[in-house]
Amino acid sequence: VXLSFAGTSYPIVGIVRFESAFDQPTSIAGSQIEHYPIEMSVGSGGVCSARDCATVDIHPRTFGNNVFVGVICSSAKWTSGRVLGTIATTQVIREYQVLQPLK
């Protein structure tokens, strides 16, 4: 994700996760949101790029809830230019662990 900001504004970028019993929640309490920070690098001209990976649990912790995952970008001086980039999400259906015998 590439972001450009005016001035010396350094954004905070992260992935957010929350659960809701509703299909389309209209409000979310701050205590319900889990935040996974993403590492940022700032280049010349205030162009920031985030290239990081985070694993987010997509299974609901409360049976029957829907899980929502998104990307958030926040800054103290919010005068943004263009926001460009792609966000890749991969869902792992199964996770395998391979154990080797001790020699």
Curated annotation (Swiss-Prot):
Swiss-Prot/TrEMBL keywords: Capsid protein, Host-virus interaction, Viral attachment to host cell, Virion, Virus entry into host cell
Known partners and oligomeric status: The virion is composed of 60 copies each of the F, G, and J proteins, and 12 copies of the H protein. There are 12 spikes which are each composed of 5 G and one H proteins.
Cell compartment(s), UniProt: Virion
Coiled-coil stretches: none
Cellular component annotations (GO), alphabetically ordered: viral capsid
Task of the protein: Major spike component. Involved in the attachment to the bacterial host. Involved in the determination of the phage host-range.
Domain of life: Viruses
Family listed: Belongs to the microvirus G protein family.
Highest classification ranks of the organism: Viruses, Monodnaviria, Sangervirae, Phixviricota, Malgrandaviricetes
Keyword Cytoplasm: no
UniProt keyword Hydrolase, yes or no: no
GO biological process: symbiont entry into host cell; symbiont-mediated perturbation of host process; virion attachment to host cell
Name used for this protein in its record: Major spike protein
